[in-house]
Amino acid sequence: RGRIHGRRTSGELLDDLTAAVKKRASRQESALQSALRAEQWFESICRQLRRVQPAVQEGAAGEAVQGPLPQPSALRADTPLQTLDTFCVLALKTTGKHPGRDELVQLSALKFRRFAPETILTVSIRPEKGLTRYAREAGVTDSMVASAPAAAEVAASIEAFLGERAPLVLFQSEELAFLPAAGIGCAGEGRTVYDVQSLTGKPDGKAPTLAEACRDLFSFTPELGGTEQEALACGLVFCALCDRTLHLTKKSAAR
């Protein structure tokens, strides 16, 4: 049979398909390589953080800290840059969603200076009521808390690290209530709190997860295995939001 004019042979179609598959595979390989480089970059930052061990006051007793918590603040173009010179990012793991009933079992506080992560304090806390399925699903194990201090024994050390004035940054600001419930003061006079999930809200009104926020802003999703990784990821997302809102890159280039 002769070839019908205008139609392509099966061989030509196969060649085109093969070329398309190779092109797509090349793009996928490039994307994977980029994601791998981004993950390695993220892990290297995490390794380079200066780690602070909390002082443990054995036998210290405590009780819930009373008083209202600060409401989340907006991030605006006129937010004074000097107010963000130092801020602290908090990432928590708990035994449930209710501060009045559930307990804090792990905390990481990561201090940023001039939008660079510097120092991190991480501590596991022994829950009085024991671990729950909720905590285990979040990655907390019995071995992490078996010999951990009680919240009251590390409260003073955590409070000292947080200070009284530096803004606090959380992915979900309502989690801040777990600190005073555990006897850890965090609501100093004039304390500013930023809710990163709200600040990264999507146009459709859906609240992104931390992993989704990272993917949307950085085109990669870091491995969020513990509170240290979560605090770093949350802090980097917040820095990106500050850059977008306050035009930090342009201001730096203009100097």
Language-model segments: residues:
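Conserved non-catalytic scaffold segment of RNase H-like nuclease domains
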Residues: 69, 74-188, 211-222
